[in-house]
Every structure is written in structure tokens, then in C-alpha cells.
Amino acid sequence: MDDKWNFINAEGQILSTQWFDWVGNFNEGLAKVGLNGQDNVINTDGQLISNQWFDGVQIFHEGFAIVELDGKWNFIDTEGQLLSKQWFDGAWIFYEGFAIVKLNGKFNFINPSGQILSQQWFNEAMAFQPKGFAIVKLNDKWNLINTEGQFVSNLWFDWIGDFNEKEGFAQVKLNGKWNFINAKGQLLSQRGFDWAWEFFYT
């Protein structure tokens, strides 16, 4: 209507008294809407969940959406509440209960309570895997961190691959040789190899 957008329900009722410049699809009971160059989120009752309009809003995943304001990043929950008092230089979606955040060129993880997982910030960080581990890089070496913020291995590696979900091993490179570690960070073999492939099944 007059280049404005809204939603209509199965009874033919217009969802919101507010008309928008653009609207997105509903996801997890919420939809992104835009007005005057800024974004917000509307629920199935036609209510905006936040009093704050943002420069950008991403889709909800695991109960949180990434929001951008003045070049900084945060998260909102399904009630429109900010997850953290800290705004970050970068933020990624929640996966397996944690989201990667970036601050001052370093990476860490944030949980659904808004707590930073580790006192140590990292040069690089990968998303948590279903096994409950995330790959992190510090000073050109790699390790695994668990959901308690503890390093899985006493060793730091030249490279770490993803955990194999069936066998529970991750491919690693240490001092130029290849090996595997288990979920406790222990090497599978006492010797290193010139090359090692991932586990295969027949």
C-alpha cells in the first residue's frame, strides 16, 4: 500500500498498525522489518520487540539475532533485550550454544547469558562443533577449547581439523608430522606421520 509493507493473517487481518518500507519472512515466530533506513523485529502479535531501531538485524538462530548499530555489533533475544553491555567489532550467529565475537582484533565466545567464555582472546576462532569443542588459534598455534573455556590439550598444534563425529578423533599436525587427538586432547599414536587422512568407513 503506497509502497509500504505489512503482514496479513489467515483471518484477513492486518498484523501491525505500522506500515514498513520492507519486511522479511517470519523465522522462529519473528520477522525483520525496515523503516526509514533502519531495522527492527516484529512478533506474531504485530508488536515491535525492541524500542531501539538498528542499522542492521540478522535472522534469529538459537534464540538470538545479531544487530548492528553505529558500526558495532551485539545480539538481541526474542524479547528484544540486548545480550551484552559490550558492543563488539564483529559477531557471528549462535551455534551449539555459543557465538563468536570480535573485539580489538581478537576473538572469543559468548554464551546465552552474555558471559565471555575464556579470559584468553584468540587470533582466530572457529564455531563450536557438536562434540562440544571449538578450534582456536593463539600465536600461530592451534588448540581446542571446551564449553567450560578450558583447553582440551596440553599441546599446541600447527593445525587442527574438525572432530570426526563417529570415532571422536581430530586430525592434527605437530612439528611437521600428522597425527590424531581424541576428545581428551591425547595423541592417538606415539609417532607422527608424513601424512594422515581422515577416518573412512566401508
Segments (PLM) and residue ranges:
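Residue-level detector of conserved, function-critical positions
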Residues: M1-T202
